[in-house]
Amino acid sequence: MATDRRVSRVSSLIKREVSQMLLHGIKDDRVGAGMVSITDVDVSGDLQHAKIFVSIYGTEQAKAETMEGLKSSVGFVRRELGQRIRLRRTPEVVFLEDTSLERGDRTLHLLNQLQDARKEEDEYIEPAQDD
């Protein structure tokens, strides 16, 4: 088992290298269908598995196409990681869609709606007290 510090360093290296591959290395047109950014990389303690969380901006169709393109390029990404990062074994790579940004945006929107509703309620109650 690798130390937490080592896992963190490998995770950040994978994130940096895969980001570079998204910009310059992956030639699949489906990957360019939506704007892709890597939000997080989760590497297992034995450095054998890497979950790469991606956030995709665009329509639902563009998101689906982009995920298909990323999943089909897993072999290329793993081979490139093996060449760019010096590890005994190159981790198995899995791309997962990260929807946390969308959930956070939706939550903020709901909180803002509640705040606006409370302001309207307070404004409605205050004039009634003046009578």
UniProtKB/Swiss-Prot annotation:
GO CC annotation: cytosol
Entry annotated with the keyword Cytoplasm: yes
A GO molecular-function annotation: ribosomal small subunit binding
GO biological process: maturation of SSU-rRNA
Transmembrane segment boundaries: none
Signal peptide: none
Main location: cytoplasm
Alphabetic keyword roster: Cytoplasm, Ribosome biogenesis
Localization: Cytoplasm
Domain of life from the UniProt record: Bacteria
Pfam families to which the protein is assigned, alphabetical: RBFA
InterPro entries in the record: KH_dom-like_a/b, RbfA, RbfA_dom_sf, Ribosome-bd_factorA_CS
Stated family: Belongs to the RbfA family.
Subunit structure: Monomer. Binds 30S ribosomal subunits, but not 50S ribosomal subunits or 70S ribosomes.
HAMAP family reported in the protein's UniProt record: RbfA
Protein task: One of several proteins that assist in the late maturation steps of the functional core of the 30S ribosomal subunit. Associates with free 30S ribosomal subunits (but not with 30S subunits that are part of 70S ribosomes or polysomes). Required for efficient processing of 16S rRNA. May interact with the 5'-terminal helix region of 16S rRNA.
Protein name: Ribosome-binding factor A
Provenance organism: Gloeothece citriformis (strain PCC 7424) (Cyanothece sp. (strain PCC 7424))
